[in-house]
Amino acid sequence: MEEIEEGSSNNSIRRVGTGSSDRRWVDGSEVDSETPLFSEIRDRDYSFGNLRRRLMKKPKRADSLDVEAMEIAGSHGHNLKDLSLLTTLGIAFQTLGVVYGDMGTSPLYVFSDVFSKVPIRSEVDVLGALSLVIYTIAVIPLAKYVFVVLKANDNGEGGTFALYSLICRYAKVNKLPNQQPADEQISSFRLKLPTPELERALGIKEALETKGYLKTLLLLLVLMGTSMIIGDGILTPAMSVMSAMSGLQGEVKGFGTNALVMSSIVILVALFSIQRFGTGKVGFLFAPVLALWFFSLGAIGIYNLLKYDFTVIRALNPFYIVLFFNKNSKQAWSALGGCVLCITGAEAMFADLGHFSVRSIQMAFTCVVFPCLLLAYMGQAAYLTKHPEASARIFYDSVPKSLFWPVFVIATLAAMIASQAMISATFSCVKQAMALGCFPRLKIIHTSKKRIGQIYIPVINWFLMIMCILVVSIFRSTTHIANAYGIAEVGVMMVSTVLVTLVMLLIWQTNIFLALCFPLIFGSVETIYLLAVLTKILEGGWVPLVFATFFLTVMYIWNYGSVLKYQSEVRERISMDFMRELGSTLGTIRIPGIGLLYNELVQGIPSIFGQFLLTLPAIHSTIIFVCIKYVPVPVVPQEERFLFRRVCPKDYHMFRCIARYGYKDVRKEDSRVFEQLLIESLEKFLRCEALEDALESTLNDFDPDRVSVASDTYTDDLMAPLIHRAKRSEPEQELDSEVLPSSSVGSSMEEDPALEYELAALREATDSGLTYLLAHGDVRAKKNSIFVKKLVINYFYAFLRRNCRAGAANLTVPHMNILQAGMTYMV
């Protein structure tokens, strides 16, 4: 890597001045036809020597097959709405292995935890606890998620960040001010805006956009939900594996607590150690194993109902809940913390929506998961009416003796699959947070060439493993882990309730009565459960709160520092007046080649460009300001990836390229492919720009009423991204042919010397090579900042920047073609 490490002072930055955002681009400066090409300049007596070798790197030609390989099938969105019934059934079967593993393993420990707090003294205790479990599953997973929350998806994507991005599209609540009107041209972005007739929706939108504290509260809410999901990634493996292994305590002599802890740790280490290989090779086994597990639960439940006490179906009467609380009072309130464990993993129904479809998840839950879980809990309750002393290990005691070992093996596999699903969900959640600028940059490894969603984040993986081992080693009991588990689960559910309510009011424009019923009903139930689990803070409930606080702090500091850094870059932009004073030579020598200057600005010229002009003795003939931008949509179609604009007059040969990605997009294209696509799209932009100029000159001879229609058509076309442009509709083409004779436009295009000059200059610069110009920046708080801001920026944010992935590695650019300049941002 070749670097120019120059410590940039504020003075050197100010020398290039600041400019008004109203003059971002200057168009209309005609190219002087007498100006020679760079090849002609090269023949003169200029000796560039080592300088040219440093600034120019010859790129390898990209194979066209590589370009076609980037067109990933299905990356344009979810085409799962009109699937046949048979296909939907197949997808529903697959959801069993990914979505419902966590909820499916809950019968291992729910009643054990409930009756550790409420001793069984009579039949009312068993029926009351069973009734609580039944209606908890019916209200939260069935009524809330299946019938309401799943519909609040973002183009088929679910989860906390999907809801946040959906809200960001309807109201400008993103704290990073890099939104552009052109983003709304993305096919997956375009949605129906709140209608003017509904003043309520517009009022909420205006309040969210104008009041900074509401933006901050919304961001904190989303980050809290994300932190709780990461906490689930720690607690789910520990809880599931320990619960499955606890079956050996009563079956194998000498298998005590120490053996349980050690065996659980061994399985956890093995589970996290194989993450780097991905789940593609064994993923096909997940659904069959979980299907076998669910049908085993249902079969064992039916067996126990028929053998012990079929009358426990009386628990379908909710009056037994009232009797349960009247009889046990405070102990019953404490038992709610164990009851909530029956819906662990309910959030996965929404978070994993992107891999399946709404209909398939609904079908799997209503037809398989829900009835099998009810039968399992009813069967355990029937067994407890005859054997109340077996509450400590009710699941394995209720299994027929002859089936113990087969069920134990299936339970262990189901626990590992449930843990795997939560670990994968944590990886995906962290990746989405990184894409939206809320998490430090980390190395992401894609473990599958066929499925773009399978990723592996080494730092997060080993962190989760260490935390799981600590949780198992410290608590040594599923009862104490359950106290922590409940807080994390309820916290995530309450966040989704608030966000879905906001979606109802802002986007769906639901009737105000129905919209308020949602938080009143489900929010009240979740609040009751939250108050119940919070009473267990001293008994293990503090663990998820510590994890959530830690990750919330990290994510908010990173977002806060990133926003301040972006605002500093906006303030220090180079003015257009200064660029005009420099002239087309930019006050230095322009040599053949293309300089790709990476920056975060979507408007204006970044101050780091002035630093390169001061530092380098020459600059490339073509400069492209490249901005990698994540927009609040799941995926951006490949043909809509690049957006080009011209910067400065034409003879400057400077452009802005915004490469747009969704928060679910995978940036793993080869640098050569990226370069080829970028150059191709730039050529198309130049041709479209010349076409627009030709149209403007031709339209002057036509009727204004007819011209305005055609002008709008072409203007919309030019505003769209320029790779593999979709063909316009036939009516539009017919209209254009009526208004504008194709012969006149075509002849003017062919005879345009300015276009031929620019294309020749671009091809010559491409042949000379591409160089990546990067900023190696440091962020510091201003001297007059308050103490807290200095502490956060100069120490915490600086620590995160030093230890996160470097910009060059994160941008996936070739290291041999890099020039870096140092710079300090004062915020």
UniProtKB/Swiss-Prot annotation:
Pfam families, sorted = K_trans (PF02705), K_trans_C (PF22776)
Q: What is the annotated localization of this protein?
A: Cell membrane
Topology, Extracellular side: 104-129, 238-253, 303-335, 385-402, 476-480, 523-536
Query: Which superkingdom?
Result: Eukaryota
Membrane topology reported for the UniProt record: Multi-pass membrane protein
Q: Where is this region: Disordered?
A: 1-31, 728-750
Carries keyword Transcription?
no
- UniProt KW keywords: Cell membrane, Ion transport, Membrane, Potassium, Potassium transport, Transmembrane, Transmembrane helix, Transport
GO CC annotations?
nucleus; plasma membrane
Main location per the UniProt record: membrane
Which residue ranges are assigned to the Cytoplasmic compartment in the record's topology? 1-82, 151-216, 275-281, 357-363, 424-454, 558-827
Any stretches that span the bilayer, and where are they? 83-103, 130-150, 217-237, 254-274, 282-302, 336-356, 364-384, 403-423, 455-475, 481-501, 502-522, 537-557
Query: What is one process in the GO biological process aspect for this record?
Result: cotyledon development
Protein name as it appears in the record:
Putative potassium transporter 12
Q: Which gene encodes it?
A: POT12
